[in-house]
Swiss-Prot record:
PROSITE patterns for the chain: MPN
Similarity-based family: Belongs to the NPL4 family.
Protein name: Nuclear protein localization protein 4
UniProt feature, compositional bias: Basic and acidic residues: 655-665
Coiled coil: none
An annotated GO cellular component: endoplasmic reticulum membrane
Keywords: Cytoplasm, Endoplasmic reticulum, Membrane, mRNA transport, Nucleus, Protein transport, Translocation, Transport
GO biological process, one term: ubiquitin-dependent protein catabolic process
Region annotation Disordered: where it falls in the sequence: 623-674
Cellular localisation: Cytoplasm, Perinuclear region; Endoplasmic reticulum membrane; Nucleus membrane
Organism from which the protein derives: Aspergillus clavatus (strain ATCC 1007 / CBS 513.65 / DSM 816 / NCTC 3887 / NRRL 1 / QM 1276 / 107)
Function: Involved in the import of nuclear-targeted proteins into the nucleus and the export of poly(A) RNA out of the nucleus. Has a role in the endoplasmic reticulum-associated degradation (ERAD) pathway.
Alphabetized CDD domains for the sequence: MPN_NPL4
Record InterPro entries: MPN (IPR037518), Npl4 (IPR016563), NPL4_C (IPR007717), NPL4_Zn-bd_put (IPR007716), Ubiquitin-like_domsf (IPR029071)
Length: 674
């Protein structure tokens, strides 16, 4: 009889815990109805699974329907054992009024206030998960620059001190031994305000993985996570119905960030800034553009990184005197693809904040200074969202990523009334606080507001942890302050340096094509502009340098005249022979971008002999934009030598002289086609 005594089994699901009194000889499928009575009403019965560990953690999960003919005693369950229950909700299921009322009563905010029954909880888990990566140092693929800096020693070499060093030229002592890249005295001497990312990483790695402990390696970096974890193993209902100390974030203590992901922003040419300023000079409105370039090593800072800007693309926007409103950018992926073919990537954003001083000497009003702000709370939130879109992958982080290399630059006036560039990044904490919806911009630009749980404007319940920061009080003592309702934006900001190269060597040398989305000031991109830039040149040697223009490349990409297949056929026998000897079939658009960035005449000769180039010339001719006619030769003049073999005129067929009226008609025809 002892064998038939009922036993107690414990069950745990994400909806809570419950117990069932069962017989050891009872079959598992007979438990379905008892289990359903303790689960929500919209559970799909066929989706119930049982496991010896929490669902999703690698336990032995079995479907309840698949345990047909299996009794409880056969799997070795004893009195008091615990099983974990997984299930899925029925799609399109309706909740009964009684359950809806009970659920509404259970929804409470942290301050005890009930969530109104009419409020629909629309909170969804964020797309950015806090899940860790197993062995990130083996599976995460970093950028080549990060791999290069990881291999460097990073030590700061010092010469032999003639006064303090008593050893020979091959010896070493405390006064001349190399310093670590994060040495505070060296940074203070060189007036380096922030550590570089790789210097900071080595600093915390020395504290995390000590050689004398002989312990297994642990990634030293960990991204802050200020959101409620929805994979809590405690078994309670997910937030906002339930919360515990395991899934709720800790209090946030803000402090200035001691490192920066990028140390310097270098603009390859002053023309990049002047072209952006031209819009403000002509319209009086502000302008925004995205920076395309590369990341390179910055030798002025130990293990430093700099962003080298080669082009600025201006997306669709509405420009006003006091700000910019961005519109949907439909061809963003196409522009990114053109940049990728040129060896570039999106490295940052730049915008103007200028107001003429009215003196007539070109001076502007100084808005941003130590007594006002350097980057407003709205701009910090904007920069944080962009940095969240472009995370940095690194093998030194538990999640496989840490921070972002995306930079934010501002063109504004300084104390002397001159236009200057300022470069910033939002801190890692700022990005996470914006992502977690903890803060919001304020009408006062120098402070950031902390969200309130009672704010129902977003139609969702929030978890707002406590936020603190430290400041010097009236007694000259550093005291901790509560950040609610607002706190200074300086805690969310990191400053960068900027500059221009000593010898300008821009990637794009002929940036004269009209800039995109400037119709409001009478500048537009059309076939006439392409013809003026390309077809007007009679010699191919003059045409090849003209394609070195990022805005022209983006416009030609939109025309889809260059093939993206690996089949380049040539038209003439001579050209086919030259191409066979010089090149193999390849992507025409990739060749176009390579010519624009390498400025190689040999590659340019291959380009003008491709079908895509011939198609472009034909389009320009048919639209009324023909190349100028060859001048008529005087019989008394000596004959001109033939051009080099393999070169041909841009025109694919000879032209006969036309009257001025016919030429004018052709131009009107071209205008009607646009």
């Amino acid at each position: 009889m002892a064998a038939t005594r009922p036993i107690i089994l414990r069950f745990e699901s994400r909806n809570g815990q419950f117990r069932l009194s069962v017989s050891p000889q009872e079959l598992f499928p007979t438990l379905k109805q008892k289990i359903l009575e303790n689960l929500p009403k919209d559970v799909e019965p066929s989706s119930i699974t049982l496991s010896n560990k929490p669902i999703g953690t690698g336990g032995e999960e079995r479907s309840l329907d698949g345990l047909e003919g299996v009794s409880i005693e056969q799997v070795g369950l004893k009195h008091g054992d615990k099983l974990f229950v997984g299930y899925q909700e029925r799609k399109g299921g309706e909740t009964t009024p009684a359950k809806a009322h009970a659920a509404a009563d259970s929804l409470r905010r942290l301050n005890g206030a009930l969530v109104p029954q009419t409020e629909t909880v629309t909170f969804r888990p964020p797309t950015s998960s806090s899940a860790t990566v197993k062995n990130p140092w083996e599976v995460v693929q970093q950028s080549p620059l990060d791999d290069k800096l990881d291999k460097k020693d990073g030590k700061i070499q010092r010469p032999r001190d003639m006064k303090m060093c008593k050893h020979g030229p091959k010896g070493m002592c405390d006064y001349c031994m190399p310093l670590e890249p994060y040495d505070p005295k060296y940074l203070a001497e060189k007036k380096i305000k922030h550590l570089s990312f790789h210097s900071y990483m080595r600093k915390i790695n020395a504290a995390t993985n000590k050689a004398e402990l002989k312990s297994s390696f642990m990634p030293p970096l960990s991204e802050p996570y200020y959101r409620v974890r929805h994979d809590c193993p405690s078994g309670h209902p997910p937030w906002p119905e339930g919360i515990c100390t395991k899934c709720q974030p800790s209090a946030i203590s803000l402090q200035p960030q001691e490192f920066r992901m990028v140390d310097h922003v270098e603009f390859s040419s002053p023309d990049l800034i002047n072209s952006l300023l031209d819009f403000w000079r002509k319209s009086g409105s502000q302008r925004l553009g995205f920076l395309y370039g590369t990341y390179e090593e910055y030798t002025e800072v130990p293990l430093g990184v700099k962003a080298v800007v080669q082009a600025i693309y201006e997306p669709p926007q509405v420009d006003e005197v006091d700000g910019v409103t961005l519109h949907e950018w439909p061809n963003e992926k196409e522009v990114d693809e053109v940049a990728r073919l040129c060896g570039l990537e999106k490295v940052g954003v730049i915008f103007t904040d200028l107001l003429d001083a009215g003196r007539g000497d070109g001076s502007v009003v100084c808005k941003r200074h130590i007594d006002s702000y350097y980057l407003s709370s709205l701009e910090i939130a904007f920069a944080s969202r962009l940095q969240a879109q472009y995370p940095k992958t690194t093998k030194w982080s538990r999640t496989g990523r840490f921070g972002s290399n995306f930079v934010t630059c501002v063109l504004s006036g300084d104390e002397e009334g001159a236009i200057t560039i300022s470069s910033y990044q939002a801190s890692v904490s700022a990005v996470e606080m914006v992502r977690a919806d903890i803060v919001e911009p304020s009408a006062e630009p120098s402070v950031m507001l902390v969200q309130s749980e009672d704010d129902d404007s977003d139609n969702k319940s929030r978890y707002i942890p406590e936020v603190f920061y430290r400041k010097i009080n009236e007694y000259g003592v550093s005291a901790q302050q509560n950040a609610k309702p607002s706190f200074p934006v300086e805690f969310l900001l990191v400053t960068l340096t900027h500059g221009f190269p000593t010898e300008s060597n821009p990637l794009f040398t002929k940036s004269t094509f009209p800039i995109e989305n400037r119709e409001v000031i009478g500048e537009s991109q059309d076939l006439r502009s392409v013809a003026k830039k390309l077809v007007s040149h009679r010699d191919s040697n003059e045409v090849i340098p003209e394609v070195s223009d990022f805005h022209l490349l983006c416009y030609l990409h939109s025309l889809s005249t260059f093939s993206k297949t690996n089949a380049n056929r040539l038209h003439s026998k001579i050209t086919r022979t030259v191409t066979t000897n010089l090149m193999t079939p390849q992507d025409e658009e990739k060749l176009l971008c390579r010519v624009a960035t390498s400025h190689d005449p040999t590659e340019g000769l291959k380009l003008i002999n491709t079908p895509g180039w011939a198609t472009l010339v034909t389009i320009l001719q048919e639209s009324g934009e023909r190349p100028p006619k060859r001048p008529w030769l005087n019989p008394a003049d000596p004959p001109r030598p033939l051009s080099q073999q393999g070169k041909r005129h841009l025109s694919s067929r000879p032209e006969s002289p036309k009257s001025e009226s016919e030429q004018l008609a052709k131009r009107f025809k071209g205008a009607s086609l646009e």
